[in-house]
Structures are given as C-alpha cells and as structure tokens.
C-alpha cells in the first residue's frame, strides 16, 4: 500500500495531531457502562465497583515485531489489540477498554493510518472493547504501536501463574506451532520475491498457518467454556513465547515441576505437513515457536472427567514436585529436560 504511486496520499501534517485523532476515532463506539468518558478529554473516565481491574500493555515495533513487506496494516492493527486482550483472558478476566498509542514516520500517509485503525476497530467490535484514548506522535523511522488493555474480574475468579499444585493436570486450548510456521512461509516468499519480483506465490496450502501469524485470535471463549464446565484453573498463562517458556513461568512461580507428554501436544495437519517441508521438528515448533495465543492452564486432577474429550482442550501433562524438574516425555518414553527457547524481547536479533 505504501508504495502505490497511483493511490491518493494525504500527509498527516495536513491534519495535525488532534485532527488525526478525531479522524481515526470518529467511528469507534462505546459498548460498556464502565466507560464513562472515552476519547476526547484529558483522560478517560472509567467506573469501577465490585470487580478488580486488570491492566496489560504490549509494544510492537516495526522491524522487531513485524515486517510490513507482508503484514497488511489492517492485520497489524487487529493483531496489536488481540495480543493484549489475550493477557486479560489469561487472567480469567473480561476485557472492556483499550488505549492505542502510535509513533509514525512521514512515509505513512493518512490512508495508511486509516487501514491500521480499521483493523483496530474490527478487533474492538469483535471482542466488544472500547477505545478510550492513546497518543500519536512522529517517528524518525517506521511505526511503533503501544496498546494497553483494561479488563475486570471478581477477586475470587482471577487466575494467576502461581497457583499450580502437584498432581494438577496441564491443559492447553487449540493447537500449537502454526503461527511460527506461517512466519517461516512468509519469510521464505519474501526472499523469493527479492530474487524474482514477478513471481506470484502459491499459498493455498498454508492458509491456516498464515492466518495464525497475521491475524491471530485471543481465546475469549475459553474462560467462558471453563465456567460452563464448572472448572476453575489453578494457574493460567497465554502462549505468546512458546509452550516450554510458558509452562516454565507457571512452574517457577508455583514452585513445582512438570511432565509434558510429546504425543499429547496438539498439532494441526498443516503444521505437521509444513514441518516436513521445512525439515523442522514439529515438537520443537510447538515448544518454542510462540505467537499461538492459546491458553495454557492447570486444573485439579479431580476435574479430569470434565475436561477430557473436549474438542477445544488437550490434556498434555501434569504437575510434579519441584525436585522432579521440568521434563518432556518423548514418544519413545525418554525424559528430556524442558528448556525455554522461545522469543526473548530483549535479545538483539540483528
């Protein structure tokens, strides 16, 4: 979009900061009674009563977290919201409001920012959250997006990472590894395009993988499902950095160990096929790929009958004594130490 010479471009400088804010937020609607004042004043006003407030923030930077050569701006806006909402759902909460702050260089016209906010608005409508504020400023290079999500939950229903107990079952929603493989496909096609710009990629066999990378969904449905099943998790976390990294967070904060069974890890057929094509071990992709935004949680073993067989959930292991360590039980029955090899936000990737 940014390179389309035939498309009309409106400089952001023509609108100014407040003109831009008014322009990109005028179609956003308020859905929650707790939103007393959204965009348009010095601060948003929220009304809180019997619930506790959940707050989470994520920062996305061009060249570090996303590549606009294959990430459409509308998808970027959607994803920026979703990754924050996922954290609220991982606390067993309900997301209600977001703020969005952006820093953009002068290479982005108004039309590009409209695309970005179209994705943000779609996410707000899909997950029923209100945009209540944020900030805009200039950037010397690229685009930066910071989203803060605000949610709520009754005190007794909030689920932390530190509540896992010995013998608890380890459960994960959905399937793992697709987002990482979607990224590998997109990066491969980017390199092919550099060599031959006329080449049109055939991505029909990778639609699920690419969608999981470019337009992930937060599992708002899982806390609802668990409540319907009368299951209260003892600990929970969303899978942003990879299964191994996340279970290690739970075990560290809960002061327990774990056993994950390789043959129980849920994998989509496209993941298995793509792993064979790329000559990558599918288990390592699930353990270390990240960006799945599924929910990983523990439940008392007494809830086994409630959880087993549910098409949205997989029991992949159990919690052990801390002295037993953190282990992966392979299909051959061998026990291997789990290691965190997922995304490190502070690692220099260059």
Residue ranges of predicted features:
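Extreme N-terminal cap/leader segments of soluble proteins
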Residues: 1-72, 100, 348-350
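Glycine-/charge-enriched secondary-structure boundary and capping motifs
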Residues: 2-19, 23-29, 107-130, 140-145, ...
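Short Gly/Pro-enriched turn/cap motifs at secondary-structure boundaries
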Residues: 33-37, 215, 285-288
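Glycine-rich anion/phosphate-binding loops
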Residues: 37, 69-85, 107-118
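Glycine-rich anion-binding loops of enzyme active sites
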Residues: 47, 60, 96-189, 318
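Short, compositionally biased
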Residues: 182-199, 203
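Polyanion-binding loop/helix "lid" in catalytic or ligand-binding cores
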Residues: 200-249
């Amino acid at each position: 979009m940014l390179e389309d010479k035939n498309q009309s471009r409106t400089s952001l400088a023509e609108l100014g900061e407040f003109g831009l804010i008014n322009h990109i937020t005028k179609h956003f609607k308020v859905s929650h009674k707790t939103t007393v004042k959204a965009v348009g004043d010095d601060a948003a006003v929220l009304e809180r009563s019997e619930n506790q407030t959940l707050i989470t923030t994520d920062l996305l930077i061009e060249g570090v977290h996303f590549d606009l050569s294959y990430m459409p701006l509308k998808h970027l806006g959607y994803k920026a919201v979703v990754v924050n909402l996922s954290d609220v759902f991982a606390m067993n909460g309900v997301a209600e409001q977001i703020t969005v702050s952006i820093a953009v260089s002068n290479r982005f016209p108004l039309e590009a920012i409209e695309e970005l906010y179209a994705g943000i608005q779609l996410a707000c409508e899909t997950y029923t959250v209100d945009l209540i504020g944020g900030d805009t400023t200039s950037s010397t290079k690229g685009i930066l997006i910071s989203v803060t999500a605000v949610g709520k939950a009754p005190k007794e229903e909030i689920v932390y990472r530190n509540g896992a107990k010995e013998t608890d079952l380890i459960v994960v929603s959905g399937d793992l590894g697709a987002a990482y493989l979607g990224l590998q496909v997109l990066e491969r096609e980017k390199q092919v395009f550099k060599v031959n710009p006329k080449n049109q990629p055939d991505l029909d066999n990778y639609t699920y993988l690419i969608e999981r990378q470019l337009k992930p969904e937060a599992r708002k449905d899982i806390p609802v499902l668990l409540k319907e099943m009368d299951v209260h998790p003892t600990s929970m976390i969303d899978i942003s950095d990879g299964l191994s990294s996340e279970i290690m967070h739970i075990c560290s904060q809960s002061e327990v160990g774990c056993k994950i069974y390789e043959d129980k890890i849920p994998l989509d057929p496209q993941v298995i096929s793509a792993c064979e094509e790329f000559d990558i071990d599918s288990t390592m992709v699930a353990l270390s790929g990240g960006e799945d935004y599924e929910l990983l949680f523990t439940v008392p073993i007494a809830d086994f009958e409630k959880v087993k067989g549910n098409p949205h959930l997989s029991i992949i292991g159990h919690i052990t004594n801390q002295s037993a360590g953190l282990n992966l039980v392979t299909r051959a029955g061998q026990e291997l130490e789990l290691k965190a090899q997922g995304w490190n936000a502070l690692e220099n990737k260059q």
